[in-house]
């Protein structure tokens, strides 16, 4: 979603060519200067950590910690810096998106209607951001000076007061859109014969989990995969993919 929201050409072309394109391997190939076929399992894993950890503005010091926690990689600061720099250069459209998200806070504060993303899906107003599937509100948005003497954006009051900044706005937009894509998939499944029989047992970020009779397991999985590979009606240009598994436990299916 993050790559398509900001129209990253290489990523969109990759998914256009192959719905199951592996962006982790593609970034690893770019990072290490080798072909996709030559990328090792460890190199792909580090690239996966980069794709998942760098999309919302993390710097090299934060990424050093992210790499250790998410992938068990013990990177030097220089190595972390090199990876972050390479990622930002490769996906410069996302970096530009962060800058636009920073500007959007001023637009909201001034009640100006402006499109944040190039698709025109996320539009500011005096309350926050309107999207095709709802809105994100930033009540009492304002600038104030923190204890270090720096000016920052915050919203909310009392215990609900929170900092808001470019990377967090980006994350809010991406997760809001992604959550609604999954919700659309879930509602579409509800209208199928299997969906009328089974309700979701749980959802986790970009996953739908169902507990079903063993005789229906293959049919349910095939139906869900088909639906989750169908782009939402409000964003037909988005390429979506899906994979799943059948197991006796949730952990066994991951």
Model-predicted segments: where are they?
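Conserved catalytic core of nucleotide polymerization and phosphodiester-bond processing enzymes
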Residues: 1-254
């Amino acid at each position: 979603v993050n790559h398509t929201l900001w129209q990253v050409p290489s990523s969109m072309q990759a998914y256009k060519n192959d719905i199951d394109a592996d962006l982790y391997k593609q970034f690893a190939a770019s990072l290490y200067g080798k072909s996709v076929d030559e990328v090792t399992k460890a190199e792909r894993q580090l690239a996966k950590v980069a794709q998942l950890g760098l999309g919302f503005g993390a710097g090299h010091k934060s990424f050093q910690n992210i790499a250790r926690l998410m992938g068990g990689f013990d990177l030097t600061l220089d190595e972390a810096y090199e990876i972050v720099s390479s990622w930002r250069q490769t996906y410069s459209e996302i970096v530009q998106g962060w800058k636009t998200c920073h500007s959007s806070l001023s637009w909201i504060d001034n009640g100006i209607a402006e499109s944040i993303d190039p698709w025109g899906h996320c539009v500011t107003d005096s309350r926050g951001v309107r999207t095709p599937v709802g809105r994100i509100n930033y009540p009492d948005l304002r600038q104030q000076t923190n204890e270090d003497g720096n000016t920052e954006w915050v919203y909310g009051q009392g215990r609900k007061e929170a900092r808001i900044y470019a990377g967090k706005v980006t994350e809010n937009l991406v997760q809001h859109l992604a959550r609604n894509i999954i919700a659309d998939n879930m509602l579409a499944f509800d209208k199928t014969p299997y969906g009328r029989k089974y309700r979701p047992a749980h959802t986790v970020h970009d996953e739908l989990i169902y507990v079903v009779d063993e005789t229906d397991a293959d049919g349910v999985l095939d139906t869900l995969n088909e639906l989750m590979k169908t782009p939402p009606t409000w964003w037909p240009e988005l390429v979506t993919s899906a994979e799943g598994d059948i197991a006796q436990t949730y952990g066994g299916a991951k």
